[in-house]
Amino acid sequence: MKFNLWTNHGAMNSTPVFKAFEIGARKLGHDVVHNSTDGVDVIWSVLWHGRMSKNQEIWDKARLQNKPVIVIEVGNIKRGVYWKIGVNGVNRDAYFAPTGFDGARRFMLDLRVKPWRDNQDGDILLVTQHDKSEQ
């Protein structure tokens, strides 16, 4: 398989992550090109703003052609250490991996589920992404 890494449109912190993706892909026998029109597109984020705004054109074209897009994004767990990688998104719409995992990774990362807390102080404000994002 050939992967096309759109490194020109990545966030400032994307360089080492794109490089790690490339090293891993090559170790598995895949070809890698950069900022080309050949191969499976790999973009940084589905936030269409700033440096990453040009990724929207890549995303839209691939989705219209029914081609997958691999999306890399900052992770929710240990930000700056772990990264999200999904096919056709990074959150609710993405495909991440086969189901049926036993949950051992949670223990490996020392993640603990805490009990729900009631808020006695009033409302909770949820702030979501803006209109320049597919998230």
Tell me what each language-model feature is.
Residues 1-53, 133:
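N-terminal pre-catalytic "stem/leader" segment of glycosyltransferase-like enzymes
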